[in-house]
């Protein structure tokens, strides 16, 4: 019997379109003899849709047309089953959902919000837990956790938007303790959205003003001179995990921007056979693998994640830039370099999810009995004690 895997993507996020690219790629790589893929698209108003045509990226050229031929749906619990249900007066059942694979990026789908909803329903889902997903979305919390656990990160300062608006001078003075050039980043966005490299205070102020409409928390980091950028993926859970090959990012600008990632498509230049070439010493590459696993475990990640590194080759140092708990395309290109097909990657993620769910189900979820059955008795005893004290007076 095939498992029905609900693939949820889209969402109210600035990375909406990136999510569609990832999801349509992955949905067409499942073993259809073992799994039935159920596409669940969430539009920018957070309305859920189902339709077989949602598996093809070609249809998304006209979103209005996509939604016209799709059904509005909800994911609900009926007894011990999870049902994808058509919205409307009659609420027709579309199918049972055995497992969910979230493939959204950014707010709501990657930051623990969707994971929290699925967790509350009790639906098994691929990937990191609510807490790990939330940490993975917040660059500030990540860095503070990494620092505490002796994982190297670049020097940084962070602040809330209202702090800059109320006392700009204090915030700038604090930032100016760092060494220029600096990166200004919204704390909770991915895909290099809203990131600027600045060389002086004038550029810094402008970059902060550009970042504030995107996030309530801003992080400013020191840059690495003559930087090399590299990615590595980790798959598994906190008990057991393994690393992919390492990819050096080829960039034509000062940093790996949104335009290079998705518009010009430079990330597609590295074919699997070109990945894992010796970009630094063997010792530094081994350090990267160890730090990647440590970062994965520190936040409590599960499934597959991608860890991005900054390399100072001259001084023989590596820094963890960030961890992504739902990497684009599930970082499958990094695993293909290790002779693992996209279908095999999906199969491994489903096995990890089943294992995680079994462990979760084995833990105590609630206490037997009902304390409220004794409420009147307990209340009566308290009242009696109060009366006894009053009588003693």
PLM features per residue range, with description:
Residues 1-131, 135-137, 141, 160-168, ...:
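ATP-binding N-terminal substructure of ATP-dependent carboxylate-amine bond-forming enzymes
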Residues 2-8, 13-24, 90-94, 133-226:
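Active-site nucleotide/adenylate-binding loops and adjacent lid/helix of ATP-dependent enzymes
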Residues 3, 9, 279-393:
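ATP-dependent carboxylate activation and anion-phosphoryl transfer catalytic cores
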Residues 36, 124, 152, 217, ...:
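Residue-level detector of anion-binding/catalytic polar loops
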Residues 38, 218-222, 230, 302-314:
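A short glycine-rich, hydrophobically flanked beta-strand micro-motif that places a catalytic Asp/Glu
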Residues 43-46, 236-239, 312-315:
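Short acidic-glycine loop/turn motifs at beta-strand connectors
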Residues 196-275, 279, 283, 317-318:
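Phosphate-binding site of ATP-dependent enzymes
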């Amino acid at each position: 019997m095939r498992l029905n895997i609900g693939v949820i993507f889209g969402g109210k996020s600035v990375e909406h379109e990136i999510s569609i690219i990832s999801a349509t790629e992955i949905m067409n790589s499942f073993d259809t003899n073992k799994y039935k893929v159920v596409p669940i698209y969430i539009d920018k108003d957070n309305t859920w849709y189902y339709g077989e045509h949602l598996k093809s990226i070609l249809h998304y050229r006209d979103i209005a047309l996509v939604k016209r031929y799709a059904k509005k749906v909800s994911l609900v619990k009926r007894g011990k089953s999870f049902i994808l249900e058509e919205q409307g007066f009659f609420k027709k059942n579309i199918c049972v959902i055995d497992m969910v694979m979230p493939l959204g990026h950014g707010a709501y789908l990657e930051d623990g919000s969707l994971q929290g909803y699925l967790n509350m329903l009790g639906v098994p889902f691929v990937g990191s837990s609510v807490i790990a997903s939330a940490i993975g979305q917040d660059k500030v919390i990540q860095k503070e956790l990494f620092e505490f656990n002796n994982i190297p990160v670049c020097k940084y300062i962070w602040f809330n938007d209202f702090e800059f608006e109320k006392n700009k001078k204090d915030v700038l003075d604090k930032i100016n303790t760092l060494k220029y050039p600096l990166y200004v980043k919204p704390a909770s966005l991915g895909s290099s959205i809203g990131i600027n490299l600045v060389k002086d205070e004038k550029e810094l102020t402008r970059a902060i003003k550009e970042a504030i409409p995107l996030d309530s928390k801003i992080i400013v980091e020191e840059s690495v001179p003559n930087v090399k950028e590299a990615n590595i993926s980790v798959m598994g859970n906190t008990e057991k995990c393994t690393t992919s090959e390492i990819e050096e990012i080829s960039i034509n600008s000062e940093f790996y921007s949104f335009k290079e990632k998705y518009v010009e498509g430079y990330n597609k230049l590295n074919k699997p056979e070109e990945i894992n070439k010796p970009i630094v010493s063997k010792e530094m590459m081994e350090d990267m693998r160890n730090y990647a696993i440590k970062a994965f475990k520190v936040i409590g990640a599960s499934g597959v994640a991608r860890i991005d590194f900054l390399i100072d080759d001259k001084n023989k140092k590596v820094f963890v830039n960030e961890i992504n708990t739902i990497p684009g395309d599930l970082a499958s290109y990094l695993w293909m370099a290790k002779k693992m097909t996209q279908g095999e990657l999906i199969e491994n993620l489903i096995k990890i999810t089943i294992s995680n769910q079994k462990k979760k189900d084995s833990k105590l979820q609630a206490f037997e009995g009902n304390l409220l059955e004794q409420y009147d008795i307990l209340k009566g005893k308290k009242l009696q004690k109060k009366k006894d004290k009053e009588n003693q007076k």
